[in-house]
Amino acid sequence: MTNFKWIVAAAGLLSGQVLAAPTATSTHAKRATVSDAAFGYASLNGGTTGGAGGTTTTVSSYAAFTSAVSGDDAKVVYVDGTIKQTADQVKIGSNTSIIGKDANAILEGFGVLVKEKENVIIRNLGVSKVLADNGDAIGVQYSNNVWIDHCDVSSDRDHDKDYYDGLIDITHGSDYVTVSNTFIHDHWKASLVGHSDSNEDEDSGHLTVTYANNYWYNINSRAPSFRFGTGHVYNSYYLDVSDGINTRDGAQLLVESNQFVDSKKALYSTDDGYAVSNDNDFGDSENTAEEGTLTSMPYDYTLLGSANVKAAVVGTAGQTLTF
């Protein structure tokens, strides 16, 4: 049984705090280490440790990055500065931690792909403006134990909805994935779990994904969209997200402690998707999803309470760490 722990932030933190919509960077970056523990689904199945204890490399070019993240030996790869390259996704090996050294660590024009791998951590990394022909900003396929944390993923909405692909797409039966503390913004189709209505044989019983403490801003749809899988979405702030959480094709979601501002469809079903909703502030929108059966998770977690989410998440989610 899940150990539900409600916390109340200090009054001084919450009182009178008004933050601009696109703000995601804290004025005081939090110090982090490569040994920080994953949580949510990524903490199960033996946990997700990435490349902790392995070799350490710092890269600042596309060629160096591509070389450093390949192979399955344990390794920590620090990204220093912005790397610009219009190219297909770079494939990441198992037992890898990709760490942005600070808020300037950005991959622009190309993304990363975790395919048929396990035990991968991506933290404090920016990924932006990856053209649809070059794949998703972050893709996870046929993989287990992946932790995406404190990232900043975006494109723009100046182009049509097919100019870019997904920001974070988790597909092909992947399991034990957590997306946390991430700023997901300025995009048409943000995050997909399960890529096709016809992929039930591969996806059913898999696609176990946690989304926690994320800031979603200026998104048209898929925040996230779940097919077939089992998902937990909690402690997240949604601003100007048209179509929010979509549960479909038999997916079971537990949606808790989120706040929506200026959303048209905050939580809804398509083709027999299901959700259980606890303590969500849907603003002017509502929950129209079919009632689900998922009422607990196989891990401990802390709920902020929907009234406290904005103050806790905005300014903390995104590339707000230093290493």
Curated annotation (Swiss-Prot):
It catalyses: Eliminative cleavage of (1->4)-alpha-D-galacturonan to give oligosaccharides with 4-deoxy-alpha-D-galact-4-enuronosyl groups at their non-reducing ends. Binds 1 Ca(2+) ion per subunit. The keyword Calcium applies. Glycans are attached at residue 95. Its EC number is 4.2.2.2. Its cofactor is Ca(2+). The keyword Glycoprotein applies. InterPro entries: Pec_lyase, Pectin_lyas_fold, Pectin_lyase_fold/virulence, PEL. PANTHER family: PECTATE LYASE 18-RELATED, PECTATE LYASE 21-RELATED. Belongs to the polysaccharide lyase 1 family. This is Probable pectate lyase A. It comes from Aspergillus niger (strain ATCC MYA-4892 / CBS 513.88 / FGSC A1513).
